[in-house]
Amino acid sequence: MTASLKANDGSAELAALMTDLGRRARAAARVLALAPPEQKNRALEAMERAIRAGAAAILDANAEDVADAKGSGANSAFLDRLTLTPARVEAMAEGIAVVRGIADPVGAVTESWQRPNGMTIERVRVPLGVVAVIFESRPNVTADAGVLCLKSGNAVILRGGSESFRSGRAIHACLVQGLREAGLPEAAITLVPTRERAAVGLLLGGLNGTVDVIVPRGGKSLVARVESEARVPVFAHLEGINHVYVDRTADLDMAKSIVLNAKMRRTGVCGAAETLLIDRAAADTHLAPLVGMLIDAGCEVRGDDAVQRADARVKPATDQDWDTEYLDAVIAAKVVDDVDDAITHIHEHGSHHTDAIVAEDAKTAAKFLGEVDSAIVLHNASTQFADGGEFGFGAEIGIATGKFHARGPVGAEQLTTFKYRIHGTGQTRP
C-alpha cells in the first residue's frame, strides 16, 4: 500500500494539488496508450496551428520573463536560453510538424520469432506511462516534451523553472487546445501551475506511484538533486563538457569552420564545445589560426603553455577549466601528443555527452569514434548537431548521458519500452 503524499517543505494544499495532478495524468496515460495514431496526429496538427496563431501571446509572455531575468542580473548565456524570438517560435511549430510526420512507435513489432513448439513471440513497443520533466530556463522544452510524450503515448507532467513560468503557460495553452480539438484528455500534458519549489520534491517522490520516469533538463545542481532524491527511474541529462579534437591530418579550413561553429553558434546550448584539443604534430600549422580565430570572434581562450605561446591574448588555464561547462563564450584549449592522448583526456574530463574529431585519416577517426565513451561522437562535424531535431526526431526531451534504456537524444521512440506478446494454439508446458 502506498503511503500518503506529504510535502516536507510545502503546504498540505500543494501536496493535495500535486497528488491530483498525478492521478489525472495516470488516467490520461491509460487513454493515450490506446489512442490511435490518427487521433494523436490530429492533436499535433492542432497544436502546430495554435503555436503559430498564439505566437504574439507567447512572445509577450516571454518578454516579461526576460525582463525579470535581466532585472535579476542573469548572464548572457542564461538569457539566450530563456529568450524566444519569432524564428524560435516558428521552429517550435515546425518541430511539432516533424514529430507528427515520424512513424508512431507505439505498437511497433521490433522482433518476432517462432519457437519449436509453434508459439509465436513478438516484442512490441509500448508507452512508459507518466513522464515528469523538470527543467529550468528553456521555455521550448514545454512544447518539445509535450509533443514527444503525446506521440509516444505517454502523459507528461511539466515543471518548468520559475524564470520561464509565463512563457511555459502560454505555450502550454496551445498544447491543451490541440488535445481538446482531438478529443484527448487535457491532463495528457500537465503544467505544474505553481512556482513553489516544494513541487519539485513532491515530483521526485513519484506522486504516490503515478510517475514512471523523471527527466531533468537543467544545470549540474538540478540533475544532481534529481539523481540523489528521485524515487523513480531517471533519464539523466548531464552537463555537456564537449571536446573537439583536431588531428594532425585535419584540413585547416574545415577545422576552423567546425571549431567556430561548435563553440560560437550558440554558446548556451548543451552541444556547445567547451574544450579544444590540438594534435602536437599539427600545432605549427593549426594552433595559432584556430586560437586567433576564436579570440577574434569574441571567445575567451584559456590554454596550457603551448596554447599561450601561440597567441599572447590567451589566458592561462587552471585544472578546473578542463572540467567546466561554460555555456558562454569561453573555451579551454590544450595541445595533446596524439589521438590516444586526446582520448585519455576526454575519458578523464568529459561528461559522456558529445565529442568530435576533425581528421582526414579514416583509421584515426575510427579509433576516436570507437574508443570515446560518449552518447554522441562525430567525425568532421560540429558538436552542435547534438540535438534531437538534427537527428530527425523532430525534437528531444533531453540528451541522456547514462547507459540504461535511453542514450543520446531522447525522442519519441526512446520514450517507449516493450512487452512480449505470445500467440499460441493451446500449448502447455511439459
Swiss-Prot record:
Q: What is this protein's function?
A: Catalyzes the NADPH-dependent reduction of L-glutamate 5-phosphate into L-glutamate 5-semialdehyde and phosphate. The product spontaneously undergoes cyclization to form 1-pyrroline-5-carboxylate.
PANTHER family noted in UniProt: DELTA-1-PYRROLINE-5-CARBOXYLATE SYNTHASE, GLUTAMATE SEMIALDEHYDE DEHYDROGENASE
State the reactions this protein catalyses: L-glutamate 5-semialdehyde + phosphate + NADP(+) = L-glutamyl 5-phosphate + NADPH + H(+)
Report the GO terms under cellular component: cytoplasm
Pathway as given in its UniProt record: Amino-acid biosynthesis; L-proline biosynthesis; L-glutamate 5-semialdehyde from L-glutamate: step 2/2
> What InterPro entries does the record point to?
Ald_DH/histidinol_DH, Ald_DH_C, Ald_DH_N, Aldehyde_DH_dom, G-glutamylP_reductase_CS, Glu-5-SA_DH, GPR_dom
Q: What EC number(s) does its UniProt record assign?
A: 1.2.1.41
GO function term, MF aspect, one: NADP binding
The organism named in the record is Rhodopseudomonas palustris (strain BisB5)
Q: Sorted alphabetically, which keywords does the UniProt record give?
A: Amino-acid biosynthesis, Cytoplasm, NADP, Oxidoreductase, Proline biosynthesis
Q: Spell out the protein name for this chain.
A: Gamma-glutamyl phosphate reductase
Is Cytoplasm there in the keyword field? yes
A GO BP term here is:
L-proline biosynthetic process
Q: Pfam families, alphabetically?
A: Aldedh
Assigned protein family:
Belongs to the gamma-glutamyl phosphate reductase family.
**EC supergroup of this enzyme:** oxidoreductase
Q: Does the keyword Amino-acid biosynthesis apply?
A: yes
Subcellular localization, per the record? Answer: Cytoplasm
